C-alpha cells in the first residue's frame, strides 16, 4: 500500500513540476473547470535521484507539502503551504530539470538530411572509411559521459553512404 501511494505521489509531483516549468503560475491553474487534471503520460518516469530530481519540500510548521509559487510583486520563486500559510523563498530557482542525452547515431538520425545542412561545415580532407569518398560533413558533440572531451564526428556526404565515424 505504501509503495502504491508513493508511486502515485511521484507521478502527481512529476506532472506538477512539468506544468510549473511550462509557465503555469500556480497549482490551481493546472486543473480544468471541473477540478480534474490529466494523468501523467505512461512514458513519464518520476525522478528518484540525479540531476532531474529537484526534491520535495515540507512545511516546518505542519509537515504538509510545500508548493512552488511565484511572488508576482518581487518576481521570486516561493514555496508555500496550503494548510497554514507558511511561505519561504526558494534557495534554488529550479523546480524541474529536463536533461536530454542522445547518442551520436541518434543525433544524425534526428536530422535525416544532415549532409545537406548548410550550417554544418564540410571537408574534403577526410576520406570515408566505407566508400572512399573524400567529402564529409562534420560536427562536434559530447558522448553520454559528461566527463569526456568533445569529439569531432564525420558523416560521409555521399547520398548512398552517409557513414558516420570519428577520428
Curated annotation (Swiss-Prot):
Expressed in the soma and in the germline. Keywords: DNA-directed RNA polymerase, Metal-binding, Nucleus, RNA-mediated gene silencing, Transcription, Zinc, Zinc-finger. The gene is rpb-9. The lineage of its organism: Eukaryota, Metazoa, Ecdysozoa, Nematoda, Chromadorea. It comes from Caenorhabditis elegans. This is DNA-directed RNA polymerase II subunit rpb-9. Zn(2+) 1 binds at residues 59, 62, 81, 84. Belongs to the archaeal RpoM/eukaryotic RPA12/RPB9/RPC11 RNA polymerase family. GO terms for molecular function: DNA-directed RNA polymerase activity; nucleic acid binding; zinc ion binding. A zinc finger (TFIIS-type) spans 124-166.
Amino acid at each position: 500500500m505504501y509503495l502504491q501511494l508513493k508511486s502515485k505521489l511521484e507521478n502527481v509531483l512529476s506532472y506538477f513540476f512539468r506544468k510549473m516549468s511550462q509557465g503555469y503560475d500556480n497549482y490551481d491553474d493546472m486543473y480544468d473547470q471541473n477540478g480534474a487534471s490529466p494523468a501523467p503520460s505512461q512514458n513519464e518516469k518520476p525522478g528518484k535521484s540525479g540531476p532531474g530530481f529537484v526534491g520535495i519540500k515540507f512545511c516546518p510548521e505542519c509537515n504538509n507539502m510545500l508548493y512552488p509559487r511565484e511572488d508576482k510583486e518581487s518576481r521570486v520563486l516561493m514555496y508555500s503551504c496550503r494548510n497554514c500559510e507558511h511561505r519561504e523563498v526558494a534557495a534554488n530557482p529550479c523546480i524541474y530539470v529536463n536533461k536530454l542525452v542522445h547518442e551520436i547515431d541518434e543525433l544524425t538520425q534526428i536530422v535525416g538530411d544532415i549532409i545537406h545542412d548548410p550550417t554544418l561545415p564540410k571537408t574534403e580532407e577526410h576520406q570515408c572509411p566505407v566508400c572512399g569518398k573524400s567529402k564529409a560533413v562534420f560536427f562536434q558533440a559530447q558522448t553520454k559521459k559528461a566527463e569526456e572531451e568533445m569529439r569531432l564526428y564525420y558523416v560521409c556526404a555521399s547520398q548512398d553512404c552517409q557513414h558516420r565515424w570519428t577520428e
